């Protein structure tokens, strides 16, 4: 009881901060970016679904694309796929299990952190990744914005 | 011979991959999937098995883990940007356990262009829509793919090659795929006597959007041999030639050897926000009475609510009942041939499934790659159409029946 008395205000603050940060983060916009030297200027949603859902493996100009998934940021990954196809990550994993374990398609390449994604985008002209808008650098090119 | 060569390929490639793994870790990916599932049924007579390849079954008063539990490991090795090796090894209940039998896939995949792809080696069978992933339970909402459609698909993989072409359009993508190869049936007896399928040709056309898809598939193949029981019955029928002029011709109809078999299916699915409606109709026939024309299908309605999926599934298999006296009035039935007549009817009935199932189920995604599933089924089996169920005795002695089966499963991927 005493424990609850002392810690309930603290708990409330933590929860409030958590809620605020969650809301703040969930409100942050996601953009899809490529290497700055990539010829592609813009992609439509169907093109991004094709690339990230294993339906087609090239940009509209015919060049091979390498979609990148982020491993250690479920918040960003979940928000991206929810915006893209309206599915939670578990259903996206189920979808990809069918493609991968039938041997039809190679899944997106995986980078661990945002820093890794950033580095990959700088090094690989075929790379295509999703990042928070605030994370875009002058070495990335935005090809799609989610509303 | 085919089996031996693919065992060697699988072993060599796996060895190379393991060695390469130390040198180029990022080029090798190890992943996998599995199911831990149990089933229990209220019938000793018509026991559950997920497909005809299984000797293990679920029956009254017990929990059976073997029919549905399995684990699979997949190795993906990128030789270059365009060339990959894929090896998949699945351990599940089956008659033989060796490198060949657990190697579900072992092939090279080459992307000629983004539109054209070729694969060669051991490939997952792509006969009906879920044939190539029927063991990957995490990939679909149900505990298992509908037995009425997939229980009769004769193999999980074939050896050969395929070529596919993909063309994106504004609202959908077109995928055309052709396969040529050969393989062996999973169907077997206690003596392990599979049927070999030669000259197996398959064509598939799919129209795929994210909200809907439509797929048409057709496969044609020639059976190279009979299993032992079938061979004995066909030979015995041929010996009736002195008493019945049609005996030799009919013996050829009884036999599966050199018979052309056709598998055709149409699949669709459509998402309406949280709802998904999907279904498949398939048709199988051959010119042998051992595999007579059969309609099979399922219709599924799923509702996605957060991490939960609730579904209702109706599936059926329909083949006409076979009576020798009606189909072959000239067949001499007397005291000495009565038993042979029963065996002929058994041959004509054991793959002639006639049953329907209504299933209700719930899938709960505990994590991104872990799902808990419960499924309850009511199956109505028709007399002489009970071949999909495991049982003692002959199919021709079976009568109409109703069976309830409960499944509980954990499906995962890694």
Describe the residue ranges of each PLM region.
Chain B
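Bacterial N-terminal signal peptides
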Residues: 9-17
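Sec/Tat signal peptide C-region and signal peptidase I cleavage site
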Residues: 17-24
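Surface-exposed strand-loop-strand hairpins of Gram-negative outer-membrane beta-barrel proteins
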Residues: 39-69, 190-191, 391-394
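Outer-membrane beta-barrel pore domains
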Residues: 43-45, 107, 235-414
